[in-house]
């Protein structure tokens, strides 16, 4: 999470209706939409490398995966959040340190959210908004698409005094596609400025065949790095959105230390072992 404060995100279903979730909820995807075609160049496909670990086995009770064992990664900071410092009301979850607020509250939205009354959102206590700017379809052609409501959401949120970032639903299968996605975000934003990060949202597709099914952990990690490095070159702050499954089993976090994690978990308190 963006140090030094904890950021909590809830979803918007309709205008100013905020659904209670846990620390940092999930984003929306779009299977196949129009616009940009996917790259087929395999030149930057990563090869497997040896993940650096301490060798220690750690038992974790993950709210999504259940009880699992992981091998501790070497040099990756651990989660130091105190679960006793989390409180909640009917809408948000909060985090405090030494009796003082240490969190910001936010929402993630896409065109599925419909029309939004931004003044109501601001008055409800929301501090920031993460807007879906677009994504890539998970079908074989991997077409990129824009979210038709993104720019109007960004303008409306900024006018209401909210901080704004964006996220992109990725299904990149090589570094070239990840870089292509970052460049596409810049094209979509144009001259529109944002003050929160650009999030890379690469997810394992459930209950359907996907172009990313055979992507190795090494390649998934390389794609995340390529995207984030390109986002930095474009003048934005990158962040990696992910639930625990991808973080534990698809990303080598020892190679992603330069980038913050936007962690997704639907639970009363976060159970992820590493810092986010």
Where are these regions (language model features)?
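N-terminal carbohydrate-binding/catalytic regions of secreted carbohydrate-active enzymes
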Residues: 84-164
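Alpha-helical scaffolding within the catalytic cores
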Residues: 90, 110-119, 143-156, 176-191, ...
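Hydrophobic faces of well-ordered beta-strands that scaffold small-molecule active sites
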Residues: 105-109, 129-131, 164-168, 198-200, ...
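Functionally critical loop-and-helix segments that line ligand-binding/catalytic clefts
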Residues: 51-106, 110-113, 119, 254-276
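Sec-dependent signal peptide cleavage junction
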Residues: 20-45
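Hydrophobic core
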Residues: 14, 18-22, 50
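Surface-exposed substrate-engagement region within the catalytic domains
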Residues: 188-198, 202-276
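Sec-dependent N-terminal signal peptides
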Residues: 2-17
